A protein has these predicted regions:
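A structural motif specific to WD40 beta-propellers
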Residues: 149-152, 194-200, 247-248, 289-290, ...
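Loop/turn segments within WD40 beta-propeller blades
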Residues: 165-171, 220-225, 261-266, 302-308, ...
Length: 513
């Protein structure tokens, strides 16, 4: 029996992906050189690492509880992966009632011996799988579940689907990006799921499907709907027309691209990469306009404020605001915010560009202002939201308030956390308006509807919820297979798309009444 480091790394990589740690999985694969290994093309069932660990524990449990005469001693105590095992059962045949203590070091030694002797085994006693612990109680969504016939499943990808985006102008088009080294542009046949889809165009990022060095990591339509930008694990940004023809191939980054954003007018494309830099590309000719080197670790997210100012965030715990044309090294940044104590996962400008929100693995979301009259020294956040109990992976501003399509409605900030909750905050009062608490697993994606009347949330348990923003009440539910990586509304507010780890996209019809 042989176990290679590449095989172990591949199991860990798949576990990270299946658990929703997309950035971590990309970083791990990049640093372990996993993309250069042939094992990445090996078919692997979901949950493989957990399955192997469970089987190893079962084997250790059998070995620990076998008596000298080959019988199994009954034991009700848990046999954990890391915690010491205390055997509370009495052994038969006058062995007495002394508990058998097996510590972590002893378990590790036994595991090594077991792996060496596994080929000599001729029979393994059947053992029931260990009970699942700390599982939340099931949630009954039958009253609000989306009925059969009101959703469409798109299933031509061959690996996890990480992101989706509806075209802002040609609203029957939706783009999806996957770990199979492709993006796809799907054309919906009609206004409802019953009409299905008419075609799907494949945008290949590698020589063959499934090339893990070409995973599509991010995508976004241009404001005019004519172009689609995609970022890949190979560090290349690509621009396609809406029919799927390649327009530009942008080569400059030295690591995976984590985020792409078009400027408001569509003149520039902004990219943030694992190589610690952000790049502004001129879309008039597909050329590099300016590269910025302010971060000391991978840049995870970027967002424009107008056509020449942007923000970026990084695993270096900082948020940096830059301006096109200002020197890209030294003291050239407009502002640098360093209030977070862990990796900063996302940054978003409010519709009018007056406020910048950031969220972090430190469990906080912060609202910043460049107006030093509001914040004093300008380096302190205007608001510091600390009510979440675990990492905050993403946040979104509502399309309301000044500078938005719905200026009469109050501005809100939504945050989604690994504590399973979505929270809505007021940037005016700094208070939490609603806690949207129904998910039983970490919430990985949220999206306001165009009117901001509703918000959709998707979790790693495959659950999609639609909530009434004003009342903070869940009104629709849909359960798909696998974990949800992203949710997105169409422009008409009649459909919500959710992309899954099961290689599929669900397009759900939404009827307000």
């Amino acid at each position: 029996m042989s176990i290679t480091s590449d095989e172990v790394n591949f199991l860990v990589y798949r576990y990270l992906q299946e658990s929703g740690f997309v950035h971590s999985s990309f970083t791990f694969a990049y640093e372990s050189l996993l993309t250069k290994s042939s094992c990445v093309n090996t078919p692997l069932p979901p949950g493989a690492l957990i399955t192997f660990l469970q089987k190893g524990l079962q084997y250790l449990a059998i070995e620990e509880h076998l008596t000298a005469d080959g019988k199994e001693r009954l034991c009700d105590s848990d046999f954990g992966l890391l915690s010491p095992h205390t055997c509370e059962a009495l052994m038969g045949g006058g062995q007495g009632g002394l508990p058998n203590m097996v510590g972590v070091d002893q378990q590790s030694s036994m595991m090594q011996d077991s792996m060496m002797d596994v080929e000599a085994e001729t029979e393994v006693l059947p053992v029931a799988p260990p009970p699942m612990v700390n599982q939340p109680p099931p949630v009954d969504d039958s009253a609000t579940e989306i009925p059969v016939g009101s959703f469409l499943t798109l299933s031509r990808h061959t690996s996890e689907v990480f992101m989706c985006s509806w075209n802002p102008v040609l609203t029957n088009l939706i783009a999806t990006g996957s770990g199979d080294a492709t993006a796809r542009i799907w054309t919906m046949s009609g206004d409802t799921a019953a009409h299905g889809f008419s075609s799907s165009v494949t945008l290949k990022h590698g020589e063959y499907l499934g090339d893990k060095n070409k995973d599509v990591t991010t995508l976004e339509w241009s404001p005019n709907g004519k172009f689609l930008a995609t970022g890949s694990y190979d560090g290349v940004a690509r621009v396609w027309d809406h029919e799927g023809n390649i327009v530009y191939t942008l080569n400059q980054h030295k690591g995976p691209i984590f985020s792409l954003k078009w400027s408001k007018g569509g003149a520039y494309l902004l990219s943030g990469s694992y190589d610690k830099t952000t790049i502004v590309w001129d879309m008039a000719g597909g050329t590099l306009k300016q590269q910025f080197n302010y971060h000391t670790a991978p840049a995870l997210d970027v967002d424009w404020n107008g056509d020449d100012v942007f923000a970026s965030c990084s695993t270096d715990k900082s948020v940096v605001i830059c301006k096109v044309g200002v020197p890209s090294e030294g003291e050239g940044s407009i502002e640098r915010f360093e209030g977070h104590t862990d990796e900063v996962n996302a940054v978003k400008w409010s519709p009018d560009g007056a406020l910048l929100a950031s969220c972090s693995d430190d469990g906080t979301a912060k609202v910043w202002s460049l107006d030093k009259k509001k914040t004093g020294d300008g380096a302190s956040p205007l608001h510091d939201f600390t009510d979440h109990t675990k990492e905050i992976y993403t946040l979104k501003w509502s399309p309301t308030g000044p500078g938005s399509p719905n200026p009469q409605k109050p501005l809100l900030l939504a945050t989604a956390s690994f504590d399973n909750d979505v929270r809505l905050w007021s940037p005016v009062t700094g208070s939490c308006v609603h806690v949207l608490s129904r998910h039983t697993q970490p919430v990985y994606s949220i999206a306001f509807s165009p009117s901001a009347t509703y918000i959709a949330s998707g979790s790693l348990a495959g659950k999609l919820y639609i909530w009434d923003v004003k009342e903070g009440k869940q009104i629709k539910a849909y359960t798909g297979k696998g974990d949800i990586f992203e949710v997105a509304w169409n422009k008409e507010e009649s459909r919500v798309a959710a992309c899954y780890s099961s290689n599929t996209i669900s397009v759900v019809d939404f009827r307000k009444k």
